[in-house]
Amino acid sequence: MSMVYFNIFLAFIVSLVGLLMYRSHLMSSLLCLEGMMLSLFVMMSVTILNNHFTLASMAPIILLVFAACEAALGLSLLVMVSNTYGTDYVQNLNLLQC
């Protein structure tokens, strides 16, 4: 495994650990999800370029489209929760709470 793949995998793991550790705030969870998506994008792009997969060259762009949609929905949810409750705690998203 080359150092490029190792560094990208390490970035994914750091983002995953950040998502697991700082899951109380919605903003930090969204940032960690974006870090995971960015590392997946770079990993896919490097793999496609190194292995000359010309048929799969659209996959990173499709992943970026899904990441942009996820970011837009996450930020709209963050604005809605912060306007309603005044904070960005994830526990405010529980619909069963009275």
Swiss-Prot record:
Known catalytic reactions: a ubiquinone + NADH + 5 H(+)(in) = a ubiquinol + NAD(+) + 4 H(+)(out)
Keywords: Electron transport, Membrane, Mitochondrion, Mitochondrion inner membrane, NAD, Respiratory chain, Translocase, Transmembrane, Transmembrane helix, Transport, Ubiquinone
GO-annotated molecular function: NADH dehydrogenase (ubiquinone) activity
Membrane topology, record value: Multi-pass membrane protein
InterPro entries (alphabetical): NADH_UbQ_OxRdtase_chain4L/K (IPR001133), NUOK/Mnh_C1-like (IPR039428)
Top enzyme class: translocase
Translocase among keywords: yes
Entry GO CC: mitochondrial inner membrane; respiratory chain complex I
Chief location of this protein within or outside the cell: mitochondrion
Positions of transmembrane segments: 1-21, 29-49, 61-81
GO biological process, one term: ATP synthesis coupled electron transport
Cellular compartment(s): Mitochondrion inner membrane
Enzyme Commission no: 7.1.1.2
Subunit structure: Core subunit of respiratory chain NADH dehydrogenase (Complex I) which is composed of 45 different subunits.
Its job: Core subunit of the mitochondrial membrane respiratory chain NADH dehydrogenase (Complex I) which catalyzes electron transfer from NADH through the respiratory chain, using ubiquinone as an electron acceptor. Part of the enzyme membrane arm which is embedded in the lipid bilayer and involved in proton translocation.
Listed PANTHER family: NADH-UBIQUINONE OXIDOREDUCTASE CHAIN 4L, NADH-UBIQUINONE OXIDOREDUCTASE SUBUNIT ND4L
Family, as annotated: Belongs to the complex I subunit 4L family.
Protein name, entry field: NADH-ubiquinone oxidoreductase chain 4L
